[in-house]
């Protein structure tokens, strides 16, 4: 069927057997759990992509995803479509305030010269750039040299490409304080601004599937920031991911999660941080 004729048709209905097949594929490859209640979301997302490439049905599209290098490229595109990347700068203000207070203490009371942060599930970059703005603003309060580095990871290659570009619409910048907009962004074209190079240089973007955390090179991280990612996973997998993230913390390091994203989870080497409207843990230092 010619691709141009698809636009006149409704969403392709998916059988229960097909749904289970696609559900298993997504969970096995990404850990994402598509519940039966979200079947229509999956149908719509797949149908739109199938129309774009002229694929006739779900079975043919599934086979395409299994076909070598071309399938891997198409898989990267599909994952980008299925992961909701609606994010914003300073999305949860209390969590960013907590990070700044914690890092201030490291610089001020512990005499630290360098702090490492990790943004897990960074999407199109708003989260790590928010962390970078906070850190850059913080270090100017201290005499002498203070440094920081941010690693930002995501499964979506298209999202990472946008993050590396660092170009955002003015609408996206509405939540950014005016002083930060003036200091950390420069206009590039009408209605769009770009992160200034000196801030962009503090963030390293890399692809990472959280199912592969066991092989991730990050170690002894001072701050792990992971919000609006765990909502995609089943409870047992959430716990597994958080446990592996905690393994990457330096002694005394802090992990910041989305409020309400994890329940009934604890580790003896972590203690809950008491900070209003946040969910965070400190890794105890050896006695």
Can you describe what each PLM-predicted range is?
Residues 2-118:
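Conserved AdoMet
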Residues 113-125, 151:
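Conserved class I S-adenosyl-L-methionine
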Residues 120, 141-225, 229-237, 262-264, ...:
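Extended basic-aromatic, gly/pro-enriched interface segments that bind polyanionic ligands
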Residues 124-142:
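Conserved SAM-binding loop of SAM-dependent methyltransferases across substrates and taxa
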Residues 239-251:
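A short glycine-rich, Lys/Arg-flanked "PGG" loop and its adjoining helix->strand segment in the class I
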Residues 251-259:
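Conserved beta-strand signature within the Rossmann-like core of class I S-adenosyl-L-methionine
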